[in-house]
Amino acid sequence: KRLKSGLTNLLSNKDITIFDGEASFINKNEISIKNRNKVIKISSNNIIISTGSKPFFPDNLKPNNKRIVDSDYVLNSKELPSSICILGGGYIGIEFAYLYNSFGVDVTIVESTNSILGFVDNEIVNELRKNYLKNGIKILESTKINEIDEKDDSISISFSNVNDQVDLNFDLLLLSTGRIPNTDNLELKNTKVKTDNFGFIKVDNKYLTNIDNIYAIGDVIGGSMLAHKASEEGSKVIEGIINPDIIKEDFIVPACIYCQP
């Protein structure tokens, strides 16, 4: 709340008008903003989509905020579980594994592919894996969930890989299975903006969609889902709108995983 309030004040001081609500496209120049029983329509020569992303969940596995939870739930939780199974060995799963382990929680990471952090250099992954195992974090790679039995006081999970099958009990199952773009409620069909099979908006090297006045930046276009990347992309878009002849320069996006080491 403090961060949101600070950003709101910063934008307001720059004479930027803020509308609270859910926006959707009417056409390529006009959007509708719904806030409770009120609907506002605004139009613009240029529109930038930066609606971010949300957690992705497998079709047969959804959070219920009881024994099966997502990252939003655990960040707002006031109690620590005694044990947790983290499904997904990407950025989010690795960071939460470190966090819970630091608080003394028994942590198990389950990754369906043959390696956690599959997008990171092997040398880094091997060092991190060695450190996690040393600190008591269990890592199950090339492993899939077969069956879940949710009880009042625990959750029983059946796992399997090419060599073995095992049943384990946990207090919580944290789903950290990736993120998908927030595009499903934008009514993009009213603009004919193109997306890929996952809903990510397609853009060119100036972040322009296939529609000549609609741009997209940040998580909604895929790639590295980082706030500072989206901020830089936003600056590039504004520069391009002001000066259409500007040449886009590629930039390297620094990233880190919040854990030790």
Residue positions per predicted region:
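Feature captures the FAD/FMN-dependent oxidoreductase FAD-binding
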Residues: K1-N46, N126, I139, N146-S156, ...
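Rossmann-like dinucleotide-binding cores of NAD(P)H-dependent redox enzymes
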Residues: R2-K4, T8, L75-N76, P81-C85, ...
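Residue-level signature of catalytic and energy-coupling elements of molecular machines
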Residues: D15, A23, I68, G88, ...
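A short alpha-helix-loop-beta-strand transition element characteristic
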Residues: D15-T17, K54-F56, K194-D196, P244-V253
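Short, conserved active-site loop motifs that form the nucleotide-linked donor/cofactor pocket
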Residues: I16, K66, I137-K138, T143, ...
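Short hydrophobic core segments
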Residues: A23, K41-G52, I86-L87, V107, ...
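Glycine-rich dinucleotide-binding loop and its adjacent helix/turn
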Residues: I49-D106, V110, I139, K189-T191, ...
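FAD-site-proximal beta/loop scaffold in flavoenzymes
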Residues: N64-L80, L168-I241, I247
